[in-house]
Amino acid sequence: MEPSIKYPIYEWELLQDTYYQKSAIGKAEWEYIDPVDFMFAVAPCGGAIAITRSESNLQSNYKYDQVPMYSICVFCLSGQLLQTLTWDKTSLVGMGWNENEELIVVSKQGQVRVYNLLGEFHQFSLGKGVENIGIRECQFSEGGVFALLQNDTFISITGFEEPWRKTYASIPFNTLEYYNIDSWALIPNPFSPDLGMDIVVTVGPHILQIDEQDSQLHSISSLQHVSHISISPNARYLALYESVGKVRVISSDFSKELLDLRLPETVAEASLKQMAWCGNDAVVLVHENLLTLVGPFGGSVPYLYNHTPIVSTEVDGVRILTKDSSEFLRKVPAPLENIFHIGSKTPGAKLVEAFQKMKLKSVFAEKMLLELKDELHDAVDTCVQASLNEFSIEWQKVLLEAASLGKNSLRMYNHQEYVDVCRELRVLNAARDPNVGIYITHEEYLHLGLERLIQRFSCRQLYGLAVQASMWMQIPCDWVYIQWAQTYIKQSSEPEEVVLDNIVKRLSSRKYISYEKIARTAYQEGRLILSTKLLDFEPLAKHQVMLLLNMEAYEQALKKVIETMDNNLIIYVVLQIKQQMAIASFFQILNEYPDAVKVYVEFAKKNDRKTLHDFFYQDDNKQGIAVLAVEDTLKTATVNQRITSLKSAAKVCSESKELSLEEKCLGDEIKLLQLQQTYEDQFTGNFVGLTVNEVVVKLIQINQTQRANKLRSDFQIPEKRFAWLKLRALVAIRDWVQIEQWAGSMRRSPIGFEPFVTEILSAGNKKEAAKYIPRCTQLTTQEKVDMWVQVGDVKSASEEAAKSKSGSVLGDLLERVQTMPESRFVQNALDQLRR
């Protein structure tokens, strides 16, 4: 191997049987600041560092002019200043980060601000009464703030968008006979309804776990005063530091004690500055300028510094920051140990050695590859995984080239995995660049997620890198362009035409990108003209509409929503406008858009008839008002109410010549209702709600023929329709006598006599039906023959057929009835015809 490349094992330290690696990840550029002199907070997963002047250490940091009073300086891990945040002249009690790299700042009065790296923030309070009590300390979880108040009670706020406050149970100091909280930490409670956090508190030699309801005392033998307590990233272990210089590690359920280590007196005598976990495997102690790594079985490794370091736990290690350095301490990942351990004979180590010999054109390289045989696949996988866990780009190349050599010798290998690893390394190395300063490990990358990492690029205004990383990983990046445009609008003082032109030019290459969020930002920044113009580029009208409503550009919103032809969206917009405007102004705007009127009318008929009536009234829409009145009759309980509603509708129609026909129809309906009410009073049965035809039928069936005739005259029922109604009414009640009398009284039936035959026959009375066949003068011989057959009178059918003197008619008839005894009549008629 080239001598210029430092072998990875040179950075390793052996702690009992486990290797740990402390890597320098860049020379800090903040040499004028010693972080230990300030209040600080380190973001997880290689994120930013926030420092501000600490009131508890003013003598040490008064000289730092580079950090202004009442300001928070945010640096990346390489020491570059990212942002300077200003806050009100209030005392801060704590700072913390979430994994979105948002800084959470808490004042002693209970005010909380959540900043992003652009300096934007939103603010809320920890609740009523906190300002008067005051906050002593605070700690942070991914989604919440936990505060110890001056009265020794705990509260929390979870959900920064919609803060939700919880108050924890009180500590029973009188029972414990100790009255000071020495240390505390947050521990997940898997049994709580919201999977929230409990608080572990040490009071003298006692340790308690408290939630909202109660406190639970845990017994730990010979426990002394605990000055520091820390929970591992996986929440399975608790580290306790006792004032006598003893370190204990117990399980988070308090069932097992895993470590009980007393430090040397020379170390224990010094004040412990910090205690933190190195991943989930070891504990780090900071005494002045000494950092001690304590292993799970009691071994330790000391690291001496020129300045007091500050430490911050990560999921796979611990970050170490001093005035002039930035380092990362972790347990050596298994793939790296397999390859680079001295004397390693693992398949991965052999493959790397074979590659190195191949570069030197050694004849032994191919022999070593052949010796791997069945282990070659495992060797390739190990090299690929080791490259992901290696910081050095030179060693990454060695490992990937070795893996490439091995996979090319395999017949069956998923090459896509190799490609994916190369892409991930490209992103990780870009993040670790000193100009970016996000020194993230692969395990932290898996924990954080690709989207959040790219979001960090964007929040640092490294938009080009964010787009490149998205392209490397083949994921959408439109949101990066949107964030760039939003930030540009917020920070630019250029004329709106210039801003618009620059945004459109930059985004023109992106098809189907949404301008709605950009336009919303312009609106929130008070740039209304720019917002409106940006909306013209929004491809989806429904996105335009929502923002136009917020901007109170109601006419534009109505115009845009009609283009969608989405009735649900149209009615939503119309109702929003109605809610925000005076009713007269609402009607005025609505009248200008007939398509919106149609949709609103259909909606209002079912949901808001009063407003619809007012709308028709102001528009002088007589027909609309009349229709509403008529529809209202269907919902009224009594006939008189219906008549009143119909009279109102008729009166409206009478005011317009164009509605004369409607007026007449309404008058007829009123007259019918009045008659129906009269009939119900005089006869049994229901008449109200029936049609004119149904009333006629019912009157005939109850032998009120004269009233039926009167109804026919009043409502001008055509003669044919009345005849049909009367026939069917009499057939329905089987009044054959009245049918016969009625038929006998008519010289000519308006509907003919064929319906008499068919209607009576359908009622099952063939004998009565046969009486009317002779009067069916309009029928052909064949039709009459068919009728006689239907009523079962074959003899009459044969006589009718014989009148035609047609052999074919008689022949067809004979064929139809030849199985019947009466067929002889047909045969006789046929014989007579042939003579």
From Swiss-Prot:
Keyword Chaperone: no
Pfam families referenced in this protein's UniProt entry, alphabetically: Vps16_C (PF04840), Vps16_N (PF04841)
Family annotation (InterPro entries): VPS16, Vps16_C, Vps16_C_sf, Vps16_N, WD40_repeat_dom_sf
One cellular component (GO) term of this entry: cytoplasm
Gene Ontology terms, MF aspect: actin binding
One of the GO BP terms on file: intracellular protein transport
Keyword terms of this UniProt record: Protein transport, Transport
Role: Essential for vacuolar protein sorting. Required for vacuole biogenesis, stability and to maintain vacuole morphology.
PANTHER family per record: VACUOLAR PROTEIN SORTING VPS16 (PTHR12811), VACUOLAR PROTEIN SORTING-ASSOCIATED PROTEIN 16 HOMOLOG (PTHR12811:SF0)
Family note: Belongs to the VPS16 family.
UniProt-recorded name of the protein: Probable vacuolar protein sorting-associated protein 16 homolog
